[in-house]
Amino acid sequence: MTSTAARAGVNRGASILDFILRIVAFLGTLVSAVTMGTTRERLPFFTQFLQFRAEYDDLPTFTFFVVANSIVCAYLVFSLALSVFHIIRSNAKKSRIILIFFDTAMLALLTAGASAAAAIVYLSHKGNAKANWFAICQQFNSFCERISGSLIGSFVGVVVFILLILLSAAALSRR
């Protein structure tokens, strides 16, 4: 086996790993967006003028989280085509550079959405006595479990995007 053939085999293996990681990130962001987007809870008691409920769209941060995860999820669907192209033609250079650029932009968007939502989830669980923000998770238990769980898939997506960027950079440096 020549050096060029060995390098092509390594690049093909990296491209297959890239494809698998993109599927993992797609599933993580999809589950996160759907879980957060369908999160709502109403408390069984209410007054004549007030009904107690919690929905994801009560907070703009959670709406941003759903939109960010949805955009990244849609991007991942389109990027799967380029990933398949890299499996077929493992020496493609320009398309890998394009993927690194857009992967980095999607990493920034996903990190912003997940981090902002994580701050609100923390406040939901712990509150902030100095600001008179009370923890709501004792009352809205199901709501808090779902919003906390939706963060997992999003942060998995963040880690996978970091790995994808490193993998693409390594594949480019071998040329």
Curated annotation (Swiss-Prot):
Protein's name in the database: Casparian strip membrane protein 1
GO biological process: cell wall organization
Keyword Glycoprotein among record annotations: no
TM helices/strands, residue ranges: 16-36, 62-82, 97-117, 151-171
Keywords: Cell membrane, Cell wall biogenesis/degradation, Membrane, Transmembrane, Transmembrane helix
UniProt record similarity statement: Belongs to the Casparian strip membrane proteins (CASP) family.
Record's GO cellular component terms: plasma membrane
NCBIfam families reported in the protein's UniProt record: A_tha_TIGR01569
Cytoplasmic-side segments: 1-15, 83-96, 172-175
Chief subcellular location: membrane
Organism: Malus domestica
Pfam families: CASP_dom
Membrane-side (Extracellular) residue stretches: 37-61, 118-150
Subunit annotation: Homodimer and heterodimers.
Function: Regulates membrane-cell wall junctions and localized cell wall deposition. Required for establishment of the Casparian strip membrane domain (CSD) and the subsequent formation of Casparian strips, a cell wall modification of the root endodermis that determines an apoplastic barrier between the intraorganismal apoplasm and the extraorganismal apoplasm and prevents lateral diffusion.
Subcellular location as annotated: Cell membrane
Membrane topology field: Multi-pass membrane protein
